[in-house]
A protein has these predicted regions:
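A short, basic N-terminal segment
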Residues: 1-50, 72-75
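Mid-core helix/loop region of P-loop NTP-binding domains shared across ATPases and GTPases
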Residues: 4-11, 18, 49, 92-213, ...
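Walker A/P-loop nucleotide-binding motif
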Residues: 47-72, 93
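Conserved catalytic segments around the Walker B and adjacent sensor/switch elements
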Residues: 53, 76-92
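AAA+ ATPase "lid" subdomain C-terminal helix
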Residues: 240-245, 253-267, 303-308, 325-327, ...
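Conserved C-terminal helix/linker of AAA+ ATPases
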Residues: 258-283
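Short alpha-helical segments that sit at the start of domains
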Residues: 281-311
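Terminal-proximal interaction/regulatory segments of ATP-powered molecular machines
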Residues: 306-387
Length: 387
């Protein structure tokens, strides 16, 4: 996928900067890949289910390493005449047990009905697929803390799958991915299946490590001599505070797009600075696109109210939400549903909702944006809703 500026190509393959792209080579994550391979070796050698827990901050490679691992593991299993399949479910996008289980079943049968089956019935359907295919399934739950904080029973059901269904020929392994250690929040029964020794930790990337990661992406995504070493160093310096490779790659892509828009022959430091100004590490494209449309509309309403003030009440936010619904031709949801959306946005870290303190009449909830500037959030949401 080649993209050209005036007289000179910029992007050789912009897809290599996508969040969905899984590179073969993952600099500075060899240790974590080897740890997963060691943990799951008994699955191939003795047909024993395994569970693992990957923990680390945003942009430290957890999701990419897990994707690379399951793809490689499936190939290795095939060489040993074993059938292993995987599914990766983002729990920010599917926040209930039912939604997660439906996503798992859709990997076996895309026509499986969205409604009409209870969770036990869905688990039974999964068992039948596994038995019929003589397969083992690795279920990767990304952002698993969202599900766990909602008191999920599904993780327990999956980790005890063999016991629940009398050890079917196909069985299930579970990989949990989270930014924080959620083991203390698991109920004792579920916790017993996740040993501390099964935890794989992902530390922040250093500036030098970010340089290596960016250099790899530059080679595959851009044409030669478009991105200099100085530009790579500058982006790594910017992202080094959080050690966030995802943020670094997003700045790299945005800087390239700005150079393209300005008909430049190469990416220069000014495009990097401009890209940083419009790219917030906590509000990546992936995060916003993970929200369904109604939640994005609620978030837009809140952001607009908070552009010039520190806090907004739920009543004020709901009034602004009604205006946004009218603007985008959407049906306004009832207060109960609005409140649920607000709780989800709080749980996901987009807003902070807390009881009002002194100086306010009656009991109400006040909402704030503590980590994200309102203006770029508004612009990103408006662009997203316009698509």
């Amino acid at each position: 996928m080649m993209v050209r500026a005036s007289g000179r190509p910029i992007f050789q393959d912009i897809r290599k900067l996508s969040f969905d792209y899984v590179p073969e080579r993952m600099p500075h994550r060899e240790k974590q890949r080897e740890a997963l391979e060691t943990l799951f070796r008994p699955l191939l050698e003795a047909h024993v289910s395994q569970n693992a827990f990957l923990v680390g901050q945003v942009g430290t490679g957890k999701t990419h390493v897990s994707k690379r691992f399951v793809l490689d593991f499936e190939r290795e299993a095939a060489r040993k005449n074993r059938t292993v399949r995987h599914v990766l479910v983002n729990c920010r996008q599917r926040m209930t047990d039912d939604a997660v289980l439906l996503a798992i079943l859709k990997t076996w049968d895309e026509r499986f009905p969205d409604r009409g089956f209870s969770i036990p019935e869905k688990l039974s359907a999964l068992r039948k697929h596994l038995e019929r295919s003589h397969a083992h399934m690795i279920v990767v739950l990304d952002e698993a803390d969202v599900l766990i904080r909602k008191s999920s029973d599904l993780i327990y059901a999956l980790t005890r799958f063999d016991e629940e269904y009398e050890a079917p020929r196909g069985s299930v392994s579970v990989v949990l991915i989270s930014q924080r250690d959620v083991l203390p929040f698991l109920d004792p029964a579920t916790l017993s299946t996740f040993r501390r020794s099964n935890m794989v930790e992902f530390g922040k990337y250093s500036q030098e490590e970010l340089v290596d990661i960016l250099a790899d992406r530059v080679k595959t995504a851009f044409f030669p001599d478009v991105v200099s070493e100085d530009v790579v160093q500058l982006i790594a310096d910017i992202a080094a505070e959080g050690g966030d490779a995802r943020y670094a790659i997003e700045i790299l892509q945005k800087a390239g797009e700005l150079a393209l828009d300005e008909n430049l022959r190469e990416v220069n430091p000014e495009q990097v600075r401009e890209a940083r100004a419009v790219t917030h590490a906590l509000l990546s494209r992936e995060s916003l696109e993970g929200l369904d449309r109604p939640k994005r509309m609620v978030l837009l309403a809140i952001a607009r109210k908070l552009e010039k003030k520190a806090y907004v009440t739920t009543g004020e936010a709901e009034e602004a939400y009604a205006v946004v619904c009218e603007e985008y031709g959407a049906n306004k949801r009832r207060h109960t549903q609005f409140w649920k959306y607000l709780q989800d946005l709080d749980l996901l870290g987009f807003v902070v909702a807390k009881p009002s303190g002194e100086g306010m009449t009656g009991k109400t909830t006040i909402i704030s944006l503590e980590d994200v500037p309102a203006k770029p959030l508004i612009e990103s949401l408006e662009a997203s809703l316009a698509r």
